[in-house]
Amino acid sequence: MAGLCSSPWVKLLLAVVLSAGLPGNMANRCKKAQVKSCTECIRVDKSCAYCTDELFKERRCNTQADVLAAGCRGESVLVMESSLEITENIQIDTSLHRSQVSPQGLQVRLRPGEERNFVFKVFEPLESPVDLYILMDFSNSMSDDLDNLKQMGQNLAKILRQLTSDYTIGFGKFVDKVSVPQTDMRPEKLKEPWPNSDPPFSFKNVISLTENVEEFWDKLQGERISGNLDAPEGGFDAILQTAVCTRDIGWRADSTHLLVFSTESAFHYEADGANVLAGIMNRNDEKCHLDATGAYTQYKTQDYPSVPTLVRLLAKHNIIPIFAVTNYSYSYYEKLHKYFPVSSLGVLQEDSSNIVELLEEAFYRIRSNLDIRALDSPRGLRTEVTSDTLQKTETGSFHIKRGEVGTYNVHLRAVEDIDGTHVCQLAKEDQRGNIHLKPSFSDGLRMDASVICDMCACELQKEVQSARCHYRGDFMCGHCVCNEGWSGKTCNCSTGSLSDTQPCLREGEDKPCSGHGECQCGRCVCYGEGRYEGHFCEYDNFQCPRTSGFLCNDRGRCSMGECVCEPGWTGRSCDCPLSNATCIDSNGGICNGLGFCECGRCHCNQRSSLYTDTTCEINYSAIRLGLCEDLRSCVQCQAWGTGEKKGRTCEECNFKVKMVDELKKAEEVVEYCSFRDEDDDCTYSYTVEGDGSPGPNSTVLVHKKKDCLPAPSWWLIPLLIFLLLLLVLLLLLCWKYCACCKACLGLLPCCNQGHMVGFKEDHYMLRENLMASDHLDTPMLRSGNLKGRDTVRWKITNNVQRPGFATHAASISPTELVPYGLSLRLGRLCTENLMKPGTRECDQLRQEVEENLNEVYRQVNGVHKLQQTKFRQQPNAGKKQDHTIVDTVLLAPRSAKQSLLKLTEKQVEQGSFHELKVAPGYYTLTAEQDARGMVEFQEGVELVDVRVPLFIRPEDDDEKQLLVEAIDVPVGTATLGRRLVNITIIKEQASGIVSFEQPEYSVSRGDQVARIPVIRHILDNGKSQVSYSTQDNTAHGHRDYVPVEGELLFYPGETWKELQVKLLELQEVDSLLRGRQVRRFQVQLSNPKFGARLGQPNTATVIIGEQDETDRSLINEISASPPLPRGDLGAPQNPNAKAAGSRKIHFNWLPPPGKPMGYRVKYWVQGDSESEAHLLDSKVPSVELTNLYPYCDYEMKVCAYGAHGEGPYSSLVSCRTHQEVPSEPGRLAFNVVSSTVTQLSWAEPAETNGEITAYEVCYGLVNEDNRPIGPMKKVLVDNPKNRMLLIENLRESQPYRYTVKARNGAGWGPEREAIINLATQPKRPMSIPIIPDIPIVDAQGGEDYENFLMYSDDVLRSPASSQRPSVSDDTEHLVNGRMDFAYPGSANSLHRMTAANVAYGTHLSPHQTHRMLSTSSTLTRDYHSLTRTDHSQSGTLPRDYSTLTSLSSQGLPPIWEDGRSRLPLSWTLGSWSRAQMKGVPASRGSPDSIILAGQSAAPSWGTDSRGAMGVPDTPTRLVFSALGPTSLKVSWQEPQCDRALLGYSVEYQLLNGGEMHRLNIPNPGQTSVVVEDLLPNHSYVFRVRAQSQEGWGREREGVITIESQVHPQSPLCPLPGSAFTLSTPSAPGPLVFTALSPDSLQLSWERPRRPNGDILGYLVTCEMAQGGGPARTFRVDGDNPESRLTVPGLSENVPYKFKVQARTTEGFGPEREGIITIESQDGGPFPQLGSHSGLFQNPLQSEYSTVTSTHSTTTTEPFLIDGLTLGTQRLEAGGSLTRHVTQEFVSRTLTTSGSLSTHMDQQFFQT
């Protein structure tokens, strides 16, 4: 075996197996790469090698193992080797009191993609020198802080001496820039801003670091405060100068540098806008600018530094910041200090009196943290530091122990490419550099690191025009590189002589090279990169024999149609090993000498259950199962004459026994047996040897002596009983003595007086409509001596205003089951996850609680199992308020109350319920009309809350009373004080009555979900809330249905809600055990809140039927089978349908003559084919059609059937369901006109559920926590076509909350919400738009719906000085919402306009107007010239325009009539909504059916997007339905076509490549097909297209996967009977474009929500949308949540199409597309982004459609902004993304091509 493992072939095989198992199959990257040279090959992957052997015939670029296995000589394999060499390594000396690292120098060279690791050691001494520099805010508000600092000199010096014996201390002060607006620039204020103060300044180094503490305090005494004007201070200037001016400050080289930053204000930062007025726009140069007096001199010329700059410079100079700030500014610095790897933050008191304690605490905290960073790292190298022993903090630093050497692991990796560019194609400075690996407190390791990008040596030694290449090419790296026009291995084949294919024809075939290759100069060059071989390419290397699905058992390779096995393997499919290693037994022999080894397996000579199948050894486990027991009786009778076989039966034993003095040890024999003899109670032993099956001549060895126990000591028993009785007597005396002492202490005045417990209040008045819960926390106080523990028992009685009420209720029915509420305090702390239902921790504890409590309470007769178990915390519970409180409910008879109470008190007193630990002293047991409980006062606790139930019932009196009473103190010496509490609950007028529609509902198990409507009758239009829960009856939770519980909240105006309960499939065992019993369960409403009341019925019974499911499963069979023979029954008479709700229709009829056995109802959506109808079976002449679409027309008919078959159907009846409130409107879009004016638009609700009649827009101010400030203003838009609003006079720099909701005939739907601050959004370079037919509202106006102007047909002229636009008196109007474009011809003509989505208006013009419809979404344009002469000529648009639009390539061509152009009204735009996909109910989300619907196609301008006349359009949707784990049904809708269809073509293949399968369907009426033999868990792409006489139409594409469980050994074989579901992969997230310059942009996206495999990276394609250039591709590696790519080299005003798709382990996923244009405006400082719209004459492809919501799974509309972005702030408004930018990133982007290495928080870049 050792020799086998040492074989070089085995090592090679292991290398191949390991490389094949790597992620992404890295071995194939070298093989699949299309390279032309050795250097290109080496750069493909770190494992790639190149064979330079001239005689080598295989692929030269492959892994080293593969080229060696293919026959390349070892000396001809060229591999670039990486290296790592330590150049300086001085060992750490722990006796030195300074920081040290090891090693100090290192040189490393890595191949692209390669990673090397090494160990890095850091030592920090116990005590090190400290430099402490105090930087203090000297604004006037810090005057008291300065006074205190002057007085605490000795304390600070004392603390420093405790920290270290070697320290220095310095002091600096700062205020702000002496400029507007930071400082008051009046002369008198510049001289003395405050009384007795110094002139304002920016920063001054007052005291450099010094060891002389006395000198420090003397200089500090002379300092005076200064002042400035605005609140934020200029501390960032001071911090930067303190860091870079090392000589002026006095920082020492080997000391710990601490910078104390003390302030009570926020800070200015780079580009925050404060310096604009003073003209300070230059960036900080990061240099020292202190004069001789220590003052900062460049405050008037340089901006503040940024946060990343400070982080970098402080780390570079080993400076650790300590932020000592007051509560006022704590929130600013709480986030700021997290950007520093090692820092501290402390709360400074208002007068800085605690600064010494704060410094001491911060120093000890900082000393325990160490940060290691890689500085000056080139772009091509990545460094990561980890540790196996040290823990990382939130900021990335390590927790260390000073005085010990810390060991760290450094991972250095060379990246392969950056933003799609290979690292070897980058600049030299990006490939190599000197990396400084630096710890926080000391100097670090210097690494000379580089990426290996050298050329292959063989390419430098090439033979130019070599004779080996017939002087027609260069010989290089073992092969010829031919000149142009020549090919072949020796360049002997001219590319012009490839026509003769006769030598490449195989006998009997008509295709050259068997159709698998290309004939070149009489030789076949096979396709497939080695797949096909042979002289005629006749051998397919994928067709060799397989074993377990693996080609050649993965132990060989396929060559010439046969398996060529690796060494050590043989057989037709390499499935037989030559080694006998698997046949070696435990003794080292072959098959134990009882068989022979063949093909790696032992074949035993004889079959026996005692031998194993592997090595023919004795199966000892089989022997031991009964061997000792079988021999026992015979050994007992022969050796001792006892046992069950003593006497004559002993002669039947077929072996003899032999008595011996000693037996062999157990490990030396087959079995060692011991048994006890029943006659004398002694133990005898014997052994079994041989093969374990004694024969007639066998002998069993028996030990002569038995082992007997000594005589028992019976006299000990009476003594133990006597001692036990004595102990019980002593305990009884002690208890009596303690009770007597307790009684005596109660009589003493000193012990009894004041030690009392009682309620805090004696009366509470509650109003039911204001109550948010059904309980009340009643405080109970303890006064006097708080030592010791007291427990108090209490009770509460309901309805005390009705005497005898509780007694009468209890005597109604003693055996009736009622719910009892139980609360206990567990002996474990409460966590956040315990209070979240559904978490794993909560579920585990719930199961533990219910199991133990059920075990205890089952001893009470009639008690059911617990339900509704929840966990919470109890505030004001003394020292145990962090413990977990469990609330649960158990059903028990009404008469069991006392038994439950006694049992609960007993178990609480014991502290456990079975194995569940509980805290003694607390419980609550709630019955129907009363409750009892106990609370505990721990030692030192003065107040606890008693949570009492309030018994809220719908039948309560308008004013009911409850009485809480403290009963006694069972534990403790306290006496009861205030014992009674009266609670009065006043019931006012309810806001609404909530109930079910009916008391009983019937559902089918096949529906999978039971939908139970809940209605509210509104009395007062406010909020109402009720709780709901399910209860078992004959149906059982988790077996027939999934139990649910929760709360329903009705908002104002809502009258209808729906409860959904998931139904479970009936298991076979359930159907056998429970038979045909009707399953039913209850849904109960309870606990009304916010003034709600429960109406009748408040309990609904849900009956689960099985017949409907059977009927529905037979729909296809019934519809496909021929009609049954009709009997004598006639058609049902007078069919009548009436809508019973938004999703229900009541259908009834009169029975026909005869005796019908039942009726069959057929119904479908009006307009659909009758073949898609649903069938229902009914025994009575009426039926309830449920689960329908709201506001939808249905057709239905009915027939009767009897014993002889069906009768004729009745006449057709139509009925429309009622309306239902619409869903929330589509995404909100904001067009920011100025800082106080915005244009708000929204999309129609996805589910209109009726006819939209109006929209309501609300907006109002919000604070930083997004909470409303003041009332919201409302605007009613009563024209549903107007989905746009212009809002003026908003407050500048203030965030607003906007909400939009829609209304139809059923009422108002839910709101769509967005919060936006206009000041943070980029402004459009355009004038205020004039928006026809758009409401314009004034934010400063009054309330309600009165303060807005609605302009329908008038043209608006808005002077710059006017707040409101004026109304034109033009009388020309347009109807039906059409829009006129004005074509100006003079400077005075009005040409501004705004086009909205289906929003129209008129414009004045001196020329003839043409009617034209705009189809873009929410865009604003400024047109200066637009001409059109006739229908055939194209219009012109000049360069002078600006757009910010979204792509709508499906433009609408105008139809010209009477000099005007208009759009046919039958065309519609928009995305598919659920209501448009008829035939599939919206509520039936079946997991085995997926619909892929596209946008309705519309032709674009200039060209007909549907192609030639008569060519079919694209099928409008694909529907996939799983039929099994390997088969599915593909359906589609018939496309539109002007000619008759001839048939369809369905193509499908694996998404990651594979054979294309095509199915031709000649029948145009067949719109579905069943596809079999698919692979489970593999993604397939399907394409469907239609054919007419004019040709094939465009195809509809969809990707689908059948997910199922597979066999572990055969991943392509599904497990029989396992579940299967469908899934479809998603595309990457919405594309976000950001302009960087006129010729470059940044593209970012989010990872797909559901990719088809593990993501390896992304592929980005960029090409001109209208052609004209080659496509460019970029690769982005990694799976970051948000990826981005900078694309340079673009052209202005040219539309580009971008595609992004994820590269996964399964191949490439679906694409996300977007078309974008970088458009420039004359005179504008920056470019802006736009998308192509229908107003241009550029012909766009019709498939580039855009959906106006980012929730689409096919395409997305990118929300675009002009200007530059920093990816830190995100605004979400209905799925759209926008990003904010800072000035810092503007300048950096223009200089570094869009690279940004540090993210920033919006707290520091937004004011």
Curated annotation (Swiss-Prot):
Q: List the disulfide bonds.
A: C30-C48, C38-C456, C41-C61, C51-C72, C245-C288, C458-C477, C469-C480, C482-C491, C493-C521, C504-C519, C513-C524, C526-C537, C544-C558, C552-C563, C565-C574, C576-C599, C583-C597, C591-C602, C604-C616, C628-C673, C634-C653, C637-C650, C682-C708
Q: Where are the Phosphoserine residues found in this chain?
A: S773, S1071, S1121, S1386, S1389, S1405, S1425, S1776
Q: Which residues form the Fibronectin type-III domain?
A: 1131-1220, 1224-1323, 1514-1609, 1627-1723
Is Membrane found in the keyword set? yes
PTM: Palmitoylated by DHHC3 at several cysteines of the membrane-proximal region, enhancing stability and cell surface expression. Palmitoylation also promotes secondary association with tertaspanins.
Q: Name one Pfam family in it.
A: I-EGF_1
User: What are the binding positions for Mg(2+) in this chain?
Assistant: S139, S141, E233
List modified residues, type Phosphothreonine: T1418, T1514
InterPro entries reported in the protein's UniProt record: CalX-like_sf, Calx_beta, EGF-like_dom, FN3_dom, FN3_sf, I-EGF_1, Ig-like_fold, Integrin_beta_N
Biological process GO annotation list? Answer: autophagy; cell adhesion; cell adhesion mediated by integrin; cell migration; cell motility; cell-cell adhesion; cell-matrix adhesion; filopodium assembly
- What Gene Ontology cellular-component terms does the record carry? basal plasma membrane; basement membrane; cell cortex; cell leading edge; cell surface; extracellular space; focal adhesion; glutamatergic synapse
Ranges for region Involved in NRG1- and IGF1-binding: 194-199
Q: Which SMART domains does the UniProt record give?
A: Calx_beta, FN3, INB, Integrin_B_tail
Please list the residue ranges annotated as the PSI domain: 29-73
What are the recorded GO MF terms, alphabetically? Answer: cell adhesion molecule binding; G protein-coupled receptor binding; integrin binding; metal ion binding
Segments of this protein annotated with the region Palmitoylated on several cysteines: 734-751
Q: How does it sit in the membrane?
A: Single-pass type I membrane protein; Lipid-anchor
- What positions does the domain I-EGF occupy? 458-492, 493-538, 539-575, 576-617
Show where the VWFA domain sits. Answer: 131-340
* Cytoplasmic domain ranges by topology: 735-1807
PANTHER family for this protein: INTEGRIN BETA SUBUNIT, INTEGRIN BETA-4
What name does this protein carry? Integrin beta-4
